[in-house]
Amino acid sequence: MSVSEANGTETIKPPMNGNPYGPNPSDFLSRVNNFSIIESTLREGEQFANAFFDTEKKIQIAKALDNFGVDYIELTSPVASEQSRQDCEAICKLGLKCKILTHIRCHMDDARVAVETGVDGVDVVIGTSQYLRKYSHGKDMTYIIDSATEVINFVKSKGIEVRFSSEDSFRSDLVDLLSLYKAVDKIGVNRVGIADTVGCATPRQVYDLIRTLRGVVSCDIECHFHNDTGMAIANAYCALEAGATHIDTSILGIGERNGITPLGALLARMYVTDREYITHKYKLNQLRELENLVADAVEVQIPFNNYITGMCAFTHKAGIHAKAILANPSTYEILKPEDFGMSRYVHVGSRLTGWNAIKSRAEQLNLHLTDAQAKELTVRIKKLADVRTLAMDDVDRVLREYHADLSDADRITKEASA
């Protein structure tokens, strides 16, 4: 900042690269402005406790996601049930622009069914941590590598994409993981996957593992982060910084337990990093409609503090905040609400309300107030707000009554002097 000698105000100088939160041009491995979203509402999201999507609803969600601009849609394994298989086939026949994937166990029986559904790719997974090797499938690393090799070669022979992922990656032995990924990369998988299945990883652990893996494999790297400890968004961002190429999301973050990286949250974070990339790639003004669609389907309310679309996401209440926002929204907003089809709201009915907000609201109602009058009226509104919550209609009524009193007083004064 520099200080103007004329009036003592500070002039804000833009950062040299235009965005202090943008990608580091010297970091050639970072993919924060060049990544793909694998949208898993119709796979991971089906594992949400309240979820039940019939065929019609799945098709509706798939079309909406495709129109929104996601790169991939991941579907529940066709082996899960007969209806799951039929739904997978139905969505594959829609002719969507995005690629359709299905998620299967590292079994040849699953692979044979999956490749016949018409999907563009198969996501193969098997547990690699000591917990899952002992209590889930009971197999050793030799068996895992052999099974992975067989399944991957089979899927590749059908001419479709294949991703191989470990499950519970961050509680797996690092040497085992790297040996496994090196083996499947040599076979020719399109992607390897890292999964924080229990949500235990920290951003630093994510960054370190992805950077290490990036030096071992030449294929793309997909990441799947659960949100048990509230780190799914930060972990997804750090994965991209470290060189990951694909991130799994679900609408509203729904999934097993308390879910995975929310689609809207990831886009909020990446928008700050590269607004142009995100606004050109995705139809952001459709995000609220997408979230409402899924929220209704699983019978939940969108949280008040939800990223971007929550009722309070662009609401400003404190007087000093409101004054600055009215002068320049960038003072207290890192996201532009209009880019997401949202609106800014300045709260004017509380004990925290400042006179700038009251004057701005009066102007919206075509009521002219001087600064002194706005300050006087603000004192009156604060007194009322100390007693009870004031709705916008309450504030508007007080504004109109005050302005009417001013008009009457002005008329009487003019008549007396005539």
UniProtKB/Swiss-Prot annotation:
Any GO MF annotation of the entry: homocitrate synthase activity
EC number: 2.3.3.14
List of residues binding L-lysine: 44, 123, 197
Enzyme class: transferase
Active site: 321
Outcome, altering residue 197 to A: Exhibits a 25-fold decrease in catalytic efficiency
UniProt-listed PROSITE patterns: AIPM_HOMOCIT_SYNTH_1, AIPM_HOMOCIT_SYNTH_2, PYR_CT
Keywords (A to Z) from UniProt: Amino-acid biosynthesis, Lysine biosynthesis, Magnesium, Manganese, Metal-binding, Mitochondrion, Transferase, Transit peptide
Pfam families xrefs: HCS_D2, HMGL-like
Sequence positions that bind Zn(2+): 44, 224, 226
Biological or metabolic pathway of the protein: Amino-acid biosynthesis; L-lysine biosynthesis via AAA pathway; L-alpha-aminoadipate from 2-oxoglutarate: step 1/5
Annotated 2-oxoglutarate binding sites: 43-44, 103, 163, 165, 197, 224, 226
CDD domains noted in UniProt: DRE_TIM_HCS
Gene3D superfamilies given in the database record: 1.10.238.260, Aldolase class I (3.20.20.70)
Mechanisms controlling activity: The activity is controled by feedback inhibition by L-lysine, the final product of the pathway that acts as a competitive inhibitor of 2-oxoglutarate.
Domain Pyruvate carboxyltransferase: 35-288
Catalysed reactions listed for this entry: acetyl-CoA + 2-oxoglutarate + H2O = (2R)-homocitrate + CoA + H(+)
Effect of residue 288 to K: Does not affect the catalytic activity but impairs L-lysine inhibition
InterPro entries: 2-IPM_HCS-like (IPR050073), AIPM/Hcit_synth_CS (IPR002034), Aldolase_TIM (IPR013785), DRE_TIM_HCS_fun_bact (IPR048253), Homocitrate_synth (IPR011872), LeuA/HCS_post-cat (IPR054691), PYR_CT (IPR000891)
Biased composition (Low complexity): 14-25
Protein family per UniProt: Belongs to the alpha-IPM synthase/homocitrate synthase family. Homocitrate synthase LYS20/LYS21 subfamily.
Stored HAMAP family: Homocitr_synth_fung_arch
Listed name of the protein: Homocitrate synthase, mitochondrial
Phylogenetic placement of the source organism: Eukaryota, Fungi, Dikarya, Ascomycota, Taphrinomycotina
